[in-house]
Amino acid sequence: MRTLTLLLSLLFLASPIAAQFGSFFDQMFGGGGHGGHGHQHQQQHQGHGQQQHPNVPSDPSIYQANYQRAHCDKYLCPDTLACVHYPHHCPCPWPSHEDKVELAEGQRVCVSRGGFKAGEAARKIELARQGLL
């Protein structure tokens, strides 16, 4: 009876471990516990309507082409390609997640809110500028 309890306990504990680390071993060893068929299985899924898109290349030419096509007779913001009157008017690329802080001489920075309340990032930048942080 004790052996049966021990065996059932081991099986119960092993299933979450297999679920957690199974894909790790599949990726590291090419399908490890599946007789080496993990790669073939992945290729089969790709053929059934689940197309995987390639990663964006590490090549600035896509950005440069968009920059060259953008028409602006004022100031073209380099990070958002927005056309504004002055550089410090440039919007942040992710305004729902960043606070815009205007610095001296028409410069601005976009700072991640990081879970802080509205205006907290700007307050910390101002404290740092004053040497208090």
UniProtKB/Swiss-Prot annotation:
Cross-referenced CDD domains: LCL2-like (cd23996)
Regions of compositional bias (Low complexity) in chain numbering: 43-53
Gene Ontology BP terms: ERAD pathway
Keyword GTP-binding: no
Keyword field contains Amino-acid biosynthesis: no
Chain residue ranges for the region called Disordered: 32-60
Alphabetical keyword list: Signal
Signal peptide: 1-19
Similarity-based family: Belongs to the LCL2 family.
The protein's name in its UniProt record: Long chronological lifespan protein 2
Organism expressing this protein natively: Sordaria macrospora (strain ATCC MYA-333 / DSM 997 / K(L3346) / K-hell)
Gene that specifies this protein: LCL2
